[in-house]
A protein has these predicted regions:
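Generic low-polarity alpha-helical segments
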Residues: 1, 12-16, 388, 393-398
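Short, hydrophobic transmembrane alpha-helix segments
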Residues: 64-79, 102, 131-132
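Alpha-helical transmembrane segments of multi-pass membrane proteins
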Residues: 54-69, 378-379
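Loop-to-transmembrane alpha-helix initiation sites
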Residues: 194-199, 382-393
Length: 421
């Protein structure tokens, strides 16, 4: 989102925890919050970051559950709108923490405490998701979001205190931008229901402009491999939550309605979709593409659709189960679309962010877009829609793997011949 060149790789500051350090990270309770090196070796996600992710998935699960209820009660449009707004709050807070931690995580006591406050904020948000969907009462959602954002503001103020020059100015712009945006979010509490989506749209755009403004002169020193790992781990956790939600729905349907025969196609198709979603996301390493702030931010922002669609697949599978056993007041077409449309969106987004940068030739490039189109067509197959979508997704994985293997074999042939000569 910004064309500023990334800063040159720097050595980790003395205050930063590094694998080579013989001093435990918690030995000094308070340390200066300075940038870690972009070229730092063996950088990996920390236990605190993994704990952070797991707590955020609690909020995602609540949003998915309410989306199921909305669609099952034929309030699809309203449910999707509320889901988009709540998911943005969860995703944006997660994303900002992730990039901040990649650049400045020093794992001291104060850093941990402020991060735990952010976790508390997302749990407050999660507690208010049902009221936001059912009563249009966003009080708990806004309060939880503001808690997370003000905690991040405090972290940026720590950076400003620990640095100087352009880096300090960048930190102050971040702190000021994030804090000012919270005033706008509080307006959601006072607007009538019809005005809330419009204010949300404005505030979401303003929030996403803060990094562009803050890093215009001095980009943060995020770590490409660490960022790619963090996004990958969160994708795994979201897909895991999707499997858990769908499994519970199938289990309840079998126990309460004795509908094993009717639910087997949904269960099998759902597993194939989720397995394929995992395979497609991780088929190629992406950290090599994150060479500049512009590329990295576009990639990071695009993951709103990746995460939201991945979680929505699970919600769609629950709707399909409820419709099959007669507990959802929607048609088979609507229930099928609840699975196929987020699946198609996931495939297209992963192709746009990942696959298209590595695929060679028209055949390889066309696999995921064509698969997305075929998955949408599966919507009209009635009770077999989910199974068909799963088979199409699995076929895409098989096709992509075969094409890649054939290209590798063709490239290996001339190389071997050259070596022989």
């Amino acid at each position: 989102m910004t064309t500023s060149p990334p800063p040159p790789p720097s050595s980790p500051s003395p205050s930063s925890p590094t694998p080579a350090s013989g001093t435990p990270a918690h030995a000094k309770p308070l340390r200066r919050l300075t940038a870690r090196g972009r070229g730092e070796a063996h950088r990996a996600a920390s236990p605190l970051e993994l704990f952070f992710d797991l707590c955020f998935v609690v909020a995602i699960a609540q949003a998915g559950m309410q989306l199921v209820h909305s669609v099952a009660e034929s309030h699809t449009g309203e449910g999707i709108l509320n889901y988009a707004m709540v998911f943005f709050a969860i995703w944006w807070a997660w994303m900002n923490f992730t990039w901040f931690a990649s650049a400045y995580d020093n794992d001291d006591v104060l850093y941990r405490v402020v991060t735990l406050i952010q976790i508390a904020g997302v749990l407050v948000l999660a507690a208010g998701v049902s009221q936001a969907f059912e009563d249009h009462d966003f009080l708990a959602v806004v309060v939880g979001y503001v808690i997370m954002r003000l905690a991040l503001t405090a972290q940026w103020l720590r950076v400003a205190r620990s640095t100087e020059g352009p880096e300090r100015a960048m930190a102050l712009r971040y702190a000021g931008g994030v804090a000012l945006c919270q005033i706008g979010w509080l307006g959601l509490l006072f607007l009538p229901d019809g005005g809330k989506p419009w204010l949300f749209l404005v505030m979401a755009l303003l929030e996403m402009c803060v990094p562009v403004y803050a890093e215009k002169d001095h980009p943060t020193s995020w770590h490409p491999h660490h960022i790619a790992e963090r996004y990958g781990l969160f994708t795994i956790i979201v897909l895991g939550e999707t499997i858990a939600a769908a499994t519970i729905a199938v289990k309840v349907g079998m126990e309460e309605n004795d509908a094993l025969d009717e639910l087997l196609p949904i269960a099998a198709g759902g597993l194939l979709i989720i397995f394929s979603a995992w395979w497609i996301y991780f088929v190629v390493p992406i950290h090599g593409r994150l060479r500049s702030s512009k590329e990295a931010f576009q990639w990071g922002y695009g993951h709103y659709l990746v995460f939201a669609s991945a979680a929505a697949i699970g919600a769609g599978l629950e709707v399909a189960v409820e419709q099959t056993v007669g507990e959802a007041h929607v048609s088979t077409l609507t229930a099928s679309a609840a699975v196929t449309l987020p699946t198609a969106l996931y495939l297209l987004t992963v192709w746009a962010l990942h696959s298209r940068h590595f695929k060679v030739g028209l055949a390889q490039q066309a696999v995921l877009p064509v698969t997305a189109l075929l998955v949408i067509c599966c919507t009209f197959l009635g009770d077999w829609a989910v199974l068909a979508a799963g088979l199409v997704s699995a076929l895409a994985v098989a096709t992509g793997t075969t094409l890649t293997a054939r290209m590798a074999a063709r490239e290996q042939g001339p190389r071997s011949a050259t070596q022989t000569v």
